[in-house]
Amino acid sequence: MSILRLLPVVLAVCTLTAAIPSQAAVAMAPAPFANGNSELGKPLNDKTCVDCHARRFGGDANRIYFRGERRVRTPAQLMAQVSYCNAELGTGYFPDEEEHIAAYLNKQYYRFE
């Protein structure tokens, strides 16, 4: 068999291998909300988020996290949603407080790595 006939297969394997992140690259990726503290985020969430979610979901504030049409699918979307809610409710949280809330929600419900 000619080596030229194997060339497309070799190229395909090389391309697929290059597209897969190495274990080292995955291990070096920063954790989402690395600057957030879930212990500081919980009381902020309890103070401002729970009541609004409960009103929107018939008294069950946690239902927002388990609904089928879940909006948040990535850490960036979670951070954006927390920022959006902060602006809509006018809570006045600073970006570091938003990250604390996102860290709490991630630990409690989302579990992004």
Located regions from the model:
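An amphipathic alpha-helix signature
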Residues: D46, P75-S83, E98-A102, N106
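Positively charged n-region of N-terminal signal peptides that target proteins for export
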Residues: M1-L6
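C-terminal capping alpha-helices of c-type cytochrome domains
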Residues: T91-E113
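Gly/Gly-Pro-rich "capping" loops immediately C-terminal to redox-active cysteine motifs
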Residues: S38-K42, A54-A87
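Amphipathic alpha-helical interaction surfaces
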Residues: D51, V72, E88, K107-R111
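The canonical Cys-X-X-Cys-His
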Residues: G41, N45-R56, I101, L105
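Bacterial N-terminal signal peptides
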Residues: P8-A18
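Electrostatic cytochrome c docking/interface patches
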Residues: S22-L44
